[in-house]
Every structure is written in C-alpha cells, then in structure tokens.
Amino acid sequence: MKIVINSHAKSNIALQHLLESLKENDIDYCDVIVVIGGHYNLNNYEITKNENITYIRVNHNSIDFTGLITLLELYNNTNEYYVYLHDTCKIGKNFYNKIKSIDLTNVSSIKINKIFSMNIGIYSQKIINEFNDFLLSKKNTNENECMKYKSINYNEDYIFNNDKNNKVLDNYDGWNYTGPIDYYNTGTMRIVEYYPNFDLYKIKANWGQGHWTLNN
C-alpha cells in the first residue's frame, strides 16, 4: 500500500507536522504521495520526488477529494491500495504495523470509523476508478467556490458508503478526542481525535461547532 496525503498550498504547517511524524515512526521506506491542491496557475500536474516521497502539485482544490481525483487521473494500477490521509493528521508508532496487518481480501475500501470517517481510510485503485463520475463532479478549479464545496452537498464518505465491499476497520465506532486547542498556533481552534484502530490522530477544525472553516 502507498500512503497518500491530501494537502493544500496553504497547509504547509500541517503537512510538515504529519511528514515529521512519519519520519519519527520509521515510515521512510514506504512510498508516500503528497497531493497539494490550490496551485491554480499550473496548466497540468507538476510532479517532483524527494527520496520516498512523490509531491504532486495540482491546479484544483476539491477539498477532501483532491487526492482521490489525482489518483483517478494519474494512476492506473488496479492492484494498488492507498492509505488516504488528510494533512491535518499525525501518526503513532504502531500505525505502520496496523496498516501492514490489514487483510485486504475481497475488500475495495475501508473506513476508520463506522459513523464518520472523513474520507480517511483505505481505497483500492479499482474503487477509485469505479467512482469516476462522482469524483470528477467534485473537481473544483475555482478558488472562490471552495467553501461551497465544503459545506453544500458535500457527500463526505460517499465512496465508502456506496461501496458494497466496504468494511470498517475493527468495527470501530468510538469518539475519543481532546480540546479544542490552537494546535498549530495559527489562530484556528481544533479538537484532536484519536483512532486507536489506526493509531492515528486527526487534528480537526470542523467538528459540529456551528460553522465551517477552511482556515489553517
């Protein structure tokens, strides 16, 4: 499995925090793909590589779907699986062992939480290809439309919820969190959710507090 990080041009603080946690926990030998949305000036995908990390800068910002759209348009190995993360995540020391031990037999996607998975989890290239029309309908190349894509008819977990072979990792349905705090010292308050089944922390700015924010 490859690790895919969904990020944005304005989210470098969060991205570097996640990448540092990967390095601290010996994930240097994994293939990591970082998809960075919001580079509207680009005519096409811009791809660079640094050691085990491939950086893909893209000219759209499709919120959680930016990375999935990029995998749809650039990758075609139908035997591949991806661990899909937001840049506002941090991994624990058991993260790699947990993903390595997951049984992918007859599975095309895996949620990390039975209720809300925030599009975080495991996707096969096959299921990404199967939801081609849905993903392309979420492709946003207009910076001024981002909030609309976040808050109106957002379809969070749409692929997970419509994949007949989807599973929930360890059947987890808990909500373990701390905060809110200004986690990144950027002025944005966040809660920190912990998913023990994945050994993953999600640093979350939108948690049902009554308004949506795209601030970093």
Walk through the language-model features, giving the residues of each:
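ER/Golgi luminal nucleotide-sugar-dependent glycosyltransferases, focusing on the catalytic module
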Residues: 1-216
